[in-house]
Amino acid sequence: MRDAITFIANSGLQFYHFDMRLDSAAQKANKFRYVERFDSLRRKFWLDEVIALPGDDDLYARKGELEQLGFISATGKLITDSDFSAVEKIDETEFFEVGNLNQVLRYFEKKWIPIPFFKKNNISNQFFGPTDWVRLYFERINETMIKVVLVADTSTSADPNDTVSPFVHENPNENIFSICSDDKSVLGFLDSLNNCEWVEDYISKLFYARETEMEQPFLRHIANYIFFMRILRSMGDVPQIHLLSDQVGFIDVDLVLDVGNSKTCAILFENASGHSFNFNSVKKLSIQDFGNPHQVHPESFSTRLVFKDATFGAFNTELNQNNKFQWPSPVRIGNEAERILNDSKVELQLTREVKSYNSSPKRYLWDNHESSFEWEYHSDDINIPPTRVYKKGISEQLNSDGTLCLDSVFGSRSVFSRKSLLTFVYLELFAQAFRQINSMEFRSLHGNPSMKRKLRRIIISCPTAMIKKEQIALRQSASQAITMINRYHGLIDAVQNTQIDVYDHTVEVIPSVKDLNLDLYNLDKRKDWIYDEATAPQLVFLYGMIKHKFDGNPDLFFNLYGKQNNNSLDKKNKNRTVTIGSIDIGGGTSDLMICRYSYNYDEITQITPEPLYWESFNLAGDDLLKEIIQQIIIEGTVSNEQDRDCSGVIENHARQLGIPEVAKKLNGFFGKDSNNIGFKGKLMRINFINQIAIPIALRYMGHANKEGDLYLSFSDLFTTNPPGKELLDYFENHFGFRFEDIRWKLSPSKVNEITQSVFSKLVGQISGLVGLYNCDIVILSGKICSFQSLENL
């Protein structure tokens, strides 16, 4: 039996991932036999399990009748020495049997399945309920192993008799739940008499899909569900859940965000009272994938968003009005958004543009105009056309342009401005952060695993020379997202009749909008730095060097790297100063900060920064990415053998094949919009850039510091998230050859050559400034700065 797992009450949706080994012997041992009879109380056919009677006559009887006659023990076993003469006998021709493990796995694989996780009492028996708080998803790895994800809606009820949501007792031993241990209760979990008809309706749809005619056995979906529950129980891998009270105090966690034009990264760190900060406890923000629930993405992620609601099963909302398993954000971001768009076929089939995604909301902080068309949820099924964005509990807070409404009259249309889209990104990030900090993994890692975590501060960095209006908009969106998520839980919990305090309304966004709004005459009243993207690396560098390399002794650091401050007014104590220049090359801007640091000799070390020069330049990683796509992927001259397969690869591959009018074809596919390029052509060009060109360019950039060339095929490049078939077919029809046939050479020298051509002038200007201010240390940050060619410049 797997150890029990712990979830904190009222900590939103919590996920637990584990592997389960399938035992072939369990299939035979857990077969389920049953009869179907019309039930007048339920007014439909219902089933009753049949079990074998002792003896050699191959006779069976209904378990329900045996229970009524007292022939079933308290443990659910048949009392074999009973007199069965009065029992109605059933032979093998009168009942049905299910027990095909592969078949039931095919029906349930990659679907969210409601699971009866019921409360245990002190004598290890189970009560019936709660009925709607745990669901299971699995994917088969091989014939003997499946990957499993459990998700629990941890919202609790204030009513101890509630059968839908869990109630948290003061006695911790009363808050242990496990998968239902007997078939009778499992059957009750699908029974309309227990208000669980929604489960049976959902399981029925998974089995019968679009079948219009049915024949006996009518209830094989229920029988297979019971068989599946038997398998889960017999494997012993489904853990018990211990639901911990959220009323024993909480621990603050801070979130630091660097929202980029193309990539975003975030870190979480605890501030447990009485403990000094430890960089080793910092965790990257992980994004739980909802489309592929077994995937969790801990790396930096794309800022692209797509409107798509997170669902945990297509349940009939008329039958299930519990309002459980609600995720507050209507957007997906990062890897999941990329995959959704790569797999999209609906736009082509609809032959119209579906306004469901945006490449980078941060680019449009100035655009507060309503969209000309309504935003729609992305659909991956042509039979389910896109619908306008409406998220219960969120849409009621918004004006039509996506801003927070100040009264109860909310907007009737989803024509959100591009500026407001960043608020939706924050909404998703904060929901993911709250999920992660209350996960069992995070709590166990940081200690005090029984205490709830809350977001306390959200620190958001920005480009060094970002204009004040955009700085305010960047942080204002975060403040609005916090407000929205607090209000959301107030609206949803009122419907659920639950008690919950998920998000702390005193969350601080740093720097605050109030701070940023101070004019030049009141800057001394500011509480916080603006945490620009060039200064942040300096702070981390100073902390790391002094604390770890110099054992916490700033004297050693300043004596080694610094110089005498001859401008000091204190002639007796001329402290040494260190001037640091930092260059951060991001996606949209390259930021420069030159700052002089001094410190005093008091008992408490105080290092004082004095900014000398700062600027942002609109030349950065996106410009390099564009040049790599243009020069390596699309068109370019092969002037020597070294350029082959890494210069104008598409153009030169076409010429080698003898394709006519190559330049015209390139212009027709990649050129500017014209009347000759229809909707499909424009869509395919966008899809090519997003699905093919950018991923390949990033692979080239990732190889920039490696030694030697690397030859890759199409399948090598796209081991995950391959381009859509429609896009590849369109490419072939346009150019006359398959894109998959192209061979690619990842050439570090070619990438570094392009990098030098893009940044040489800028680096020369920055180097002049660094020399002018006589910097003692120069810090390079950002992915591009790791390229050898840039260091050489």
Annotate the PLM regions.
Residues F218-F228, E353-Y357, G411-I437, I467-L474, ...:
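Phosphate/oxyanion-binding active-site loops and adjacent basic polyanion-contact surfaces
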Residues W375-S379, Q436-R453, K549-N575, S639-I677, ...:
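Short helix/loop segment immediately N-terminal to the Walker
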Residues M1-E396, D622, E627, I632-G636:
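Early-domain small/polar-rich strand-loop-helix modules and first-structured segments
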Residues N278-F373, I594-H734:
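Phosphate-binding glycine-rich/basic clefts of nucleotide- and phosphate-handling proteins
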Residues F228-F250, L421-S450, Q538-K571, P723-N774, ...:
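Phosphate/ATP-binding catalytic cores across multiple sugar-kinase/actin-like superfamilies
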Residues L257-Q295, D532-A536, F541-T637:
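Glycine-rich phosphate-binding loop of actin/hexokinase-like ATP-binding domains
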